Amino acid sequence: MKKSRFAALAVAASLVTMSAVAIAPAAHASSCEAKQLGSVIAEVCSGKTSDGANYEYRTNTENFNGTVYLWSHGYRYAVNLPAGIQPPGGTTPYIVDMSAEVGPSTYVVNQLLAAGYAVAGSGFDTQGWTVGSAIKTNVELIGILKSELPDTKGVIAWGASMGGFITQALAERFPKLIKSAAPICTAAGNVNAELTYAQDLLWGMKTFFDPSITVSGYADGPAGVGQAALNLQKVIAVLTHIGTTILETDNSK
């Protein structure tokens, strides 16, 4: 009798487990709506991967050619920054951004949609240096895309800065999941290498253009992140000045 009860409980537990596994994908099903994006009426779908990353993909419903561009965004700060400290491309005060990103700009995304491509991307499950988990998120997102867009013939992975390195690593580890990759302005392969690269750049900027730029000795925690953000603003100001000077020189010829 005891054995029969045990067997019945085991079977019931197995059925519950199998049911949970069977319905798990539904928990991550995308929510879709039609939107006018540039010259295209696109289906914009969003959801979350199993690690909690927000994702989005957009499809030209009238002219999808079967190719999806999978974008990996660059480095985003992992802490909030107070007003007055504005990271490049961010806002002030800066709030950690977990939103999905499907391309480098609205213009580029809309041009791809108009040409018949679909675009996709996520916000990853965390910010900061997040290469490892970002690759995992991308692998899962590719599975979602191929499931929900059955006409998909291939995926092109692309990304910029840290997103470029994520793209490169994805292509090396999972070459069969994509048909091509386009790493853009790729970051160095790990945090130490990236910091060394950044220090070299800062040293050059400090030596030749702005002695107030800090190369090392940052404070711990958010205060140090704030110092780094201010430094980046100074570097951008230097680069802007250089670019303006070059244009003025060219125009004077």
Predicted features and spans:
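N-terminal cap/lid segment of alpha/beta-hydrolase-fold proteins
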Residues: 30-68
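Short beta-strand element of the alpha/beta-hydrolase
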Residues: 66-76
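Primarily recognizes the serine-hydrolase "nucleophile elbow" in alpha/beta-hydrolase
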Residues: 154-207
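Secretory targeting and sorting signals
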Residues: 2-29
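Alpha/beta-hydrolase active-site loop
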Residues: 128-149
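Short, solvent-exposed loop/turn and secondary-structure capping segments
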Residues: 79-93, 131-134, 169-171, 191-197
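Accessory cap/linker subdomain of secreted extracellular hydrolases
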Residues: 32-42, 187-253
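Conserved alpha/beta-hydrolase
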Residues: 106-128
